[in-house]
Amino acid sequence: MKVVALFLFGLALAAANPSWEEFKGKFGRKYVDLEEERYRLNVFLDNLQYIEEFNKKYERGEVTYNLAINQFSDMTNEKFNAVMKGYKKGPRPAAVFTSTDAAPESTEVDWRTKGAVTPVKDQGQCGSCWAFSTTGGIEGQHFLKTGRLVSLSEQQLVDCAGGSYYNQGCNGGWVERAIMYVRDNGGVDTESSYPYEARDNTCRFNSNTIGATCTGYVGIAQGSESALKTATRDIGPISVAIDASHRSFQSYYTGVYYEPSCSSSQLDHAVLAVGYGSEGGQDFWLVKNSWATSWGESGYIKMARNRNNNCGIATDACYPTV
C-alpha cells in the first residue's frame, strides 16, 4: 500500500508542477526517493515564488536585474552558500596597483573580444572558486604575453596547492596563495592534461604538461573601483572577491546586479572581472563566474559599478605577473 501511495504521489507531483518536471529534465535531477523529492520540490517552489515576486519588481522598474530558475533552484540558500563558494581572504601584497591615471577614457572594456578569456567553466559542488579565479587571471596574462590562450588546470590547484599554502581544496582557498604556489611550483598544468573532477584528490602535477607560469601577483588598491577600472583596462582580467551569499545572486539571470544588503567586507566567492561598461544608464563590471553557462548571462554577471563598492568587488582584487 505504501508503495502505491508513493507512486500516486509521484504522479501528482508531475501533474501539478510542470515547471518542476522541466527543471528535473533540464538539469538531470534524480533523487534518492520520493521523500527527498518532496523536500526538494518544496524548496523549488519556495525559490520559484521568490523569483516570480522579485521579477514583478523588475517589471515595475524597481530593480535593474531579474532572476530565473537555474541549477540551484532546488537548493536552500543555506545549502547553496555551504557548497558553492570557497573564497578565503588572502594576505595583502607588498606590490599594490594604485594607478588612476588620465589615459584616454574607455567607456567599455571586454577582454573576451580580445581573446584573453577561456570559456565559462563549472566548479560543481566543490568550494574551489578560488582555483577558477586564479587560473582565469593567469590564463589572461599568459595570453597577453604570448598570444596563446591556454586553459589551465583548476584540479591541480585543488589537489596540490595545500600544505604550506594553506588552501583547502573543495573547502576553500586563497587566490593570492594559489598564485604563490604556481610561482614556486614552476607552473600549472593544462586543463586537458589534468582535467577537473570537482573533488579533492592526490597531487598529480606533471612538469611535462605545464601550460603557464607566473612570477607573483599585484594587489589592487583596496576598495578603489577607480584603480580596479584602470587595472582592468590596462592590465587584463582581474581576480576579484565578492559577497555572493544572497538569494538574488543564487538566482541571477540578467541585468545589472545591485544588492543593497551586500557586504563590502564579508566576501565569500572569487570570480574574474573581464571588463566593464554601462547598460540602461547603469555602470557595471563584467564578471566571469565558474557555475557553468546555465547560470546568469551564459555564465557571466553584470555587477553594479560605481555604487560604493557594492558586494565588495574592489575590496580584494589582484592579478598575476607572468
UniProtKB/Swiss-Prot annotation:
What residues form the catalytic site here?
C129, H269, N289
Q: What is this protein called?
A: Digestive cysteine proteinase 1
Q: Pfam families from the xrefs?
A: Inhibitor_I29, Peptidase_C1
Q: Which family does it belong to?
A: Belongs to the peptidase C1 family.
Q: Which residues form the propeptide?
A: 17-105
* Signal peptide interval: 1-16
Molecular function terms, GO-annotated: cysteine-type peptidase activity
| GO annotation, biological process | proteolysis
In this UniProt entry, which cysteines form S-S bonds?
Answer: C126-C170, C160-C203, C262-C311
**Annotated EC:** 3.4.22.-
Keywords of the record: Disulfide bond, Hydrolase, Protease, Signal, Thiol protease, Zymogen
Statement: the UniProt record of this protein carries the keyword Repeat: no
